[in-house]
Amino acid sequence: MNIDFSIVIPTLNSEKYLKETIRSIISQDKSINIQLIFSDGGSKDQTLEIIKSINEKNCLKEIIYNQIGLTKALNEGFKKAKGKYLTYLNSDDMLSKNALINIKNNFEQKKNNEWIIGFCENVGDKYFLNNLVNFYKKNLLKFINFNLLSINNVISQPSVFWKKSFFHKVGEFDENIKFNMDYDMWLRMIKVSKPDVIDNNISFFRRHNKSLSHNNLISQFKEKYKIMRIHNKNLVISTIHLLLSAFIVFIYKITNY
């Protein structure tokens, strides 16, 4: 079977949302051949049973057993990738309907594209704030460039896809980074090739109080600033980044977002 997409999904006691994540993938267009690579950190719940129950003709599944951290888990997963196009999802993310066929068609129609970004919809119980973030990111994403990305990461990880050959060119995820390995990767990618932004909702990001992005908020933003400074030495950009980050942290804290 010729694999179109390899999707890495790190898991750890992920039974609550994993079925929905998997369903959103296997319900894609049946002409798409998918490799699902689960990198499990030692789940004690029903996570592995859920994974083993996948039985789709167009879906190849693999499980990597590890307790080595998220970034290492991603790299180990992508070493197993057989598809032309790569991405990764958290175990509570979801793809939108027709996401993969839209991405595949874009890559095939625009041969020079190295990576593609679509829109992502934040979902959860904070309806107003989710809609505000969705509006903010969607409109800024249309103007994405290196400096804008340096000011703030407006790219939503579940809606990013790249060619396997491009991944080899830019290198694997930095295993010294705990929270923002995706932000570092996007900055490295955009310095090599500008992404194509497509006007489609590609994924859903589930925001809840147990998600990594909800917890460790201050540590996450401190790390993000350090990453940005490695890639962009411009003091004006750095200052704007800091001010915007402080404002975002303030809003997130007072609203418990």
PLM feature segments, named:
Residues 3-6, 35, 184:
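Cell-envelope/extracellular polymer assembly enzymes that use nucleotide-activated donors
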